[in-house]
């Protein structure tokens, strides 16, 4: 951290990331801080006092050596304009983290969907085989608050974080997929793709790029990277067997010329999780693990909360919590993985609603729509599937459970895959998912 000695640094954004930056830099540098959200400023005041909170109109923001920007702050924000006008470098918490951990190995994962599961799965595989690779980043653990390691880290990086990173070099960079998302932040789809591709800007001759070539956008990036002879490329696919790369087809993992049976794990169902497994397997092989050890670790993985999380079964009914599925593309992955689904969906709808799920409505036994999206979703589903319009998630769950119990089908699944953000009725997707877990567990406790 000597590079920041006696410097004047501004911290903009006081959520989890901003707080972690402050705790890293406090008492070492001349700091000022701010956040547009009064709630975040109030939390900061309670923790650290009011002395450092400085509005943007204060001239001290124009006389800084650096500004550490939280990833949620749009690059069109006034603080960014000030930084550019006064030639103040903007950095991120990832830059600070890398500076103090630069001798370690970094595995970075990005993609529109599946980042958190893949990050956790890679960490699980490595750690269960005697290595020490904690998770950090967008997975919910700010990098600067990550568990100490002498070996390396598995970092989940969003496009927002990749926009900010300046000095970070990775051992392995993973690109899982790219689908339309965050288009309120980016000018267009090309701008969003370029943000994701930045994960490959920070590689050296010893680095590996692991890329899903089933995805059209990712495949184009793969083709471009083939022109750079210094980067080692590992493609993966779940639709075809690759001669050189990792494939999962027909419940088998194909590792170049070798073939292994895919381990059964209820927490990793569906084609989307095959992508996550393929990427994780590739990374573990790069780090040096044997295939047998990797497969054993995959079979013992416990899924992250709220991400196609298997809760349990009773009366031939299985309960799955995919509260993190905040758009139709994410929800579709869970729906593809199951049959005879009693589907709970609703909240604040995203553009396009559930139109993208219509080709798979045959997997849904009955739907239960709630929240702001209920009328919109009902309009999409009418004359195609049975549905009930509900006031809230708890009411939807109770009706769904009653219907599932009366169904004589051998296997039934109650799935929370909202396809919406949660803010109309919940603080966040975690709170929504916890309610579903609580309601599910009532029936076998």
UniProtKB/Swiss-Prot annotation:
Supply the Gene3D superfamilies for this chain. Mur ligase, C-terminal domain, Mur-like, catalytic domain, NAD(P)-binding Rossmann-like Domain
So, what pathway does this thing act in?
Cell wall biogenesis; peptidoglycan biosynthesis
- Coiled-coil annotation reads none
Where mainly located? Answer: cytoplasm
Q: Could you tell me the superkingdom of the organism this chain comes from?
A: Bacteria
Q: Would you indicate the residue range of the signal peptide?
A: none
Q: Where in the cell is it found?
A: Cytoplasm
**How would you classify this enzyme at the top EC level?**
ligase
* EC number(s) reported in the record: 6.3.2.9
Asked if the keyword Cell wall biogenesis/degradation belongs to this entry, the reply reads yes
A GO MF annotation of the entry reads: ATP binding
What keywords are assigned to this protein? ATP-binding, Cell cycle, Cell division, Cell shape, Cell wall biogenesis/degradation, Cytoplasm, Ligase, Nucleotide-binding, Peptidoglycan synthesis
Q: What are the GO cellular component annotations?
A: cytoplasm
* Reactions accelerated catalytically: UDP-N-acetyl-alpha-D-muramoyl-L-alanine + D-glutamate + ATP = UDP-N-acetyl-alpha-D-muramoyl-L-alanyl-D-glutamate + ADP + phosphate + H(+)
Q: What GO biological process terms does the UniProt entry carry, in alphabetical order? A: cell division; cell wall organization; peptidoglycan biosynthetic process; regulation of cell shape
Residues that coordinate or bind ATP? 111-117
User: Quick check: keyword Ligase in the entry?
Assistant: yes
Q: What does this protein do?
A: Cell wall formation. Catalyzes the addition of glutamate to the nucleotide precursor UDP-N-acetylmuramoyl-L-alanine (UMA).
What HAMAP family does the entry give? Answer: MurD
Q: Which family does it belong to?
A: Belongs to the MurCDEF family.
Q: What is this protein called?
A: UDP-N-acetylmuramoylalanine--D-glutamate ligase
What organism, scientifically named, is this protein from?
Rickettsia prowazekii (strain Madrid E)
């Amino acid at each position: 951290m000597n590079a920041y000695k006696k410097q004047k640094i501004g911290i903009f954004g006081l959520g989890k990331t901003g707080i972690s930056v402050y705790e890293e830099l406090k008492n070492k540098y001349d700091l000022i801080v701010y956040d547009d959200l009064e709630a975040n400023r109030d939390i900061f005041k309670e923790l650290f006092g009011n002395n450092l909170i400085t509005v943007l109109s204060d001239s001290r923001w124009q006389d800084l050596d650096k500004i550490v920007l939280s990833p949620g702050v749009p690059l069109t924000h006034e603080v960014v304009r000030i930084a550019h006008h006064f030639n103040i470098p903007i950095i991120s918490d990832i830059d600070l983290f890398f500076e103090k951990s630069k001798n370690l190995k970094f595995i970075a994962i990005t993609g529109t969907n599946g980042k958190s599961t893949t990050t956790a799965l890679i960490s699980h595989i490595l750690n269960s085989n005697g290595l020490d690779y904690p998770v950090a980043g967008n997975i919910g653990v700010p990098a600067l608050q990550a568990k100490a390691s002498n070996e390396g880290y598995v970092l989940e990086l969003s496009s927002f974080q990749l926009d900010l990173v300046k000095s970070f070099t990775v051992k392995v960079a993973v690109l899982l997929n790219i689908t339309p998302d965050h288009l309120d932040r980016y000018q267009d789809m090309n701008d969003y793709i370029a943000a994701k591709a930045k994960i490959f800007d920070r590689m050296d001759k010893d680095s590996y790029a692991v890329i899903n070539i089933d995805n059209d956008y990712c495949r184009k990036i793969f083709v471009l990277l083939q022109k750079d002879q210094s980067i080692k490329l590992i493609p993966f696919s779940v639709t075809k067997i690759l001669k050189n790369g990792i494939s999962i087809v027909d419940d088998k993992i194909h590792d170049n010329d070798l073939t292994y049976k895919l381990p059964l794990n209820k927490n990793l169902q569906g084609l989307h999780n095959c992508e996550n497994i393929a990427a994780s397997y590739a990374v573990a092989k790069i780090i040096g693990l044997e295939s047998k050890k990797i497969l054993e670790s995959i079979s013992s993985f416990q899924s992250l909360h709220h991400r196609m999380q298997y809760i349990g079964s009773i009366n031939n009914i299985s309960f799955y919590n995919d509260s993190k599925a905040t758009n139709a593309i994410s929800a579709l992955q869970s729906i593809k993985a199951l049959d005879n689904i009693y589907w709970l969906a609703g909240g604040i709808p995203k553009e396009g609603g559930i139109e993208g799920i219509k080709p798979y409505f045959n997997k849904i036994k009955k739907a239960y729509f709630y929240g702001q999206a209920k009328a919109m979703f009902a309009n999409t589903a009418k004359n195609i599937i049975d549905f009930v319009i509900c006031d809230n998630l708890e009411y939807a769950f109770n009706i769904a459970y009653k219907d599932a119990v009366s169904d004589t089908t051998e296997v039934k699944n109650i799935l929370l895959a909202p396809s919406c953000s949660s803010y109309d009725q919940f603080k966040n997707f975690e709170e929504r998912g916890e309610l579903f877990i609580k309601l599910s567990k009532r029936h076998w406790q």
